[in-house]
Curated annotation (Swiss-Prot):
Domain of life of the source: Bacteria
Function, as annotated: Involved in preservation of envelope integrity and tolerance to surface stress. Reverses the inhibitory effect of PspA on ClgR activity. Facilitates intracellular growth of M.tuberculosis.
Protein's UniProt name: Putative envelope-preserving system protein Rv2742c
Keyword Flavoprotein among record annotations: no
Feature: compositional bias, Basic and acidic residues: 31-54
Organism in which the protein naturally occurs: Mycobacterium tuberculosis (strain ATCC 25618 / H37Rv)
Lineage of the organism: Bacteria, Bacillati, Actinomycetota, Actinomycetes, Mycobacteriales
Amino acid sequence: MLVDELGVKIVHAQHVPAPYLVQRMREIHERDENRQRHAQVDVQRRRDQPERGQHQHRRNRDADHHPDGRTLAGQIVAHPVSHRVRQPRPVAIADVLPRVGPRADCVVAHSLQGSPRRRERRRGQTAHQRLGRRSGNAIACPLYLENAAGPEPDTKRAEGRRFGAFGGGDLRWMADRVPRQGSGRRGLGSRSGAGVPQGADARGWRHTADGVPRVGQPAIRRGVPGFWCWLDHVLTGFGGRNAICAIEDGVEPRVAWWALCTDFDVPRSMGRRTPGG
């Protein structure tokens, strides 16, 4: 036969996959390869960043139920990276450090609007109630910490305890009254330079002894030795970024948590750059 002479083999009932099935299998194979490649890159990145292991070692070393061996400032500065998504950092810190509770008397600039009775009612709200509440492009942020084991009476706290507000619209934070106890300082004025403390210019740059400008000014020093509550606001393309930093005496300031004045999520890592920052 002609078929035998040409060496052509006839195969009966052979399955031929449809073209769309072949394309589908190729897509699945490429997806698996991409996942494997991304996993390898992530493993390599973890090896190249030893601070990830340091954070884990710190979590294992400093148990949450043994906070008495460190000062309050040390607990906040050495706080591990929050592993929660869409979780405000003050809430995460309050969960780890039960003896410390964030609280803000006057949080957002929008809370200064309305009738006096309404402002007083808003001022009585706690920071936990305001953290998830946004008004415009501003989000509530606590301005200081206090020891929950010895809280002050409400009557004493309500009078003369308004530390300030941070407005997302005009990027201004006010501190009209600051306690005079201890090493407390008067807070900042607006960006126009009114009320700026000594050593800072109208833009809010604070020049240290070595001449290096640093953004932010000390807002208030609480009764806890070595603890400073530091308010930074860095102008970005998306609005203002408000950071509360906790530092110990003689130690460079480190961010304890972030409070964003944008619509982005709160960063999960300590000191991570925000979008546009």
